[in-house]
Design a protein with these regions (language model features):
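Conserved beta-strand/loop block within the catalytic cores
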Residues: 1-2
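Active-site/substrate-binding loop(s) of hydrolase catalytic cores
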Residues: 6-18, 22-155
Length: 156
């Protein structure tokens, strides 16, 4: 769809596989799409909502699979490499956009203009108390405007 065709819709962007050793989001996203479209008539079950999904953001790292990558992680036996083929950690490239992967993602982001971006990092097999965890930036390090926004949406 063209961007103008999406005006008036709630737009969600799902990004998986930013670190190839944390690839569960790719599998979960593909399963989600399967379940959302595997209904009678294959109709999208959420009218007024558009979804863009990047299943493997770090393709170089995903394809560089080895049992010697991330040896301190609790499984799986083989996993991809954390960085790109140029050894960039894409998680640290959002501002500078040095990598072609990040420039492509930011192009999609700017064109799609999502209301919500879900970056599906995963743990290394640790057993956490909660099914879903999230992280907010350290309050005292934020710009005053961001502090106000964070307090309004997440803390009040």
């Amino acid at each position: 769809a063209e961007p103008e065709d999406l005006s008036g819709t709630l737009r969600l962007l799902l990004v998986a596989g930013i670190h190839a050793g944390e690839i569960e989001g790719k599998d979960a996203g593909i399963m989600l799409l399967r379940d959302l479209t595997n209904n009678e008539g294959h109709r999208w079950p959420f009218p007024g909502t558009s979804l863009a999904f990047v299943p493997i953001f770090n393709l170089d790292g995903h394809e560089r699979s080895s049992r010697f990558n991330r040896i301190n992680q609790n499984g799986p036996d083989n996993m991809g490499w954390r960085g790109t083929s140029q050894r960039y950690n894409l998680n640290r490239d959002f501002l500078k956009a040095d990598t072609p992967e990040m420039r492509a993602l930011l192009g999609l982001w700017n064109q799609f203009d999502p209301h919500l971006v879900y970056d599906s990092h995963t743990t290394d097999g640790a057993d956490y108390q909660y099914d879903l965890t999230w992280h907010l930036e350290q309050f005292d390090l934020l710009d005053a405007g961001l502090r106000k926004w964070q307090r309004r949406f997440f803390e009040d």
